[in-house]
Amino acid sequence: MAEHLMSTYARLPVEFERGEGIWLWDTEGRQYLDALSGIAVCGLGHAHPDIASAIAVQAGQLVHTSNLYGIPHQSRLADRLCSLADMERVFFCNSGAEANEAAIKIARLYGHSRDIDSPDIVVMDNSFHGRTMATLTATGNRKVQAGFEPLVQGFIRVPYDDLDAVRKVADNSSNAVAVLVEPIQGEGGINVPADDYLAGLRQLCDEHDWLLMLDEIQTGMGRTGEWFAYRHAGILPDVVSLAKALGNGV
């Protein structure tokens, strides 16, 4: 293993060098079934020939331009995502953590537009939203937060799948402006809420003029049988964050 990599993870003593579909091969030639889909990233498998071809063609044409200019493929993808999600606008960034960071910034902007100087976002126990400072604070796991204090202010934490706890916040907080929640918790243990949970959150957000922001980084792009997990609840959120399978590792 590379001696100059920072020890940010407890890496297993395996190095993969190639993949095909659901299979991976390590540097010793051993074959593995990737039952995790590259931690929910490789929704189309490894080394899909159509994806490899598209990457090669684009690399031969143009790799990067500034977003000061129009980017045709970006516009087409935004149109497609909005069509699938019934949403109106897309903001592209580099990772799931950045997507959730952007959602947090949107909520704060929304709060300030309502003359709330210190807007709060309701977040959940056992959640995971990323490792930037704001998303780390939103994450409901003290283990991953330890050592990075002081954390960012502006979050109110409640138990997952507990509408009464959110109602209590609504009854007692004049600064709350949004709810950030995973439709199904991933890192927290694959916790599936009650069937009426997301619909209940949507109703509470409507009643109090809050934003409902769904972290679909693990559940989005077809992983639950619908393009987005919120489709099962028959609701429409205000903000959706995507990553992982959206890029298939690219």
Predicted regions located by residue number:
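Conserved N-terminal phosphate-binding loop of PLP-dependent enzymes in the Aspartate aminotransferase
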Residues: 1-250
